[in-house]
Design a protein with these regions (language model features):
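Soluble extramembrane domains flanking the early transmembrane region of eukaryotic membrane proteins
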Residues: 1-140
Length: 140
């Protein structure tokens, strides 16, 4: 027994938090995305990793995008967590625009949440999918 006693309930989309960045934090975040920083979560001693964002070449300029949605896929067997992974959803990313730039106008990506980040708050969301597996805890 792992001590995990969760209930297997899927979460379609839920708000995790909302953050407003200072100008210094904004620049640090931009640099972290440009330098391919990643996060690590650990659930029941199972590590999960993912990038905090990505850069995309648009009109000859690389623009940093912050991943603002995380999807967790959790597999269980009985009351034991067997596998845990996390992925990002590119449809729910936020472009980090330079607040001093004239380029802070809406872009062509209708599905992308756009923010100047130092002027607006950025909402972070998550979803969870639970699946049953026959893999025993001893083989996780």
């Amino acid at each position: 027994m792992t001590g995990w006693t969760g209930r297997a309930a899927d979460v379609r989309m839920a708000k995790l938090c909302e953050l407003t960045f200072t100008a210094v934090e904004y620049q640090q975040l931009r640099h972290a995305i440009e330098d391919n920083y990643y996060f690590e979560f650990v659930v029941d001693k199972l590590p999960m990793w993912g990038f905090i964002g990505e850069t995309k070449l648009e009109g000859g300029t690389y623009r940093p995008y912050l991943f603002t949605h995380l999807h967790f896929h959790l597999a269980f067997n009985g009351d034991q967590l067997i596998d845990a992974t996390v992925s990002t959803d590119a449809k729910l990313e936020t472009v980090l625009l330079d607040p001093s730039s004239a380029a802070a106008a809406p872009n062509d990506h209708a599905e992308t949440r756009e923010s100047t980040a130092s002027r607006e708050s950025v909402e972070f969301t998550y979803s969870v999918t639970w699946t049953h597996t026959d893999v025993p805890y001893s083989r996780r």
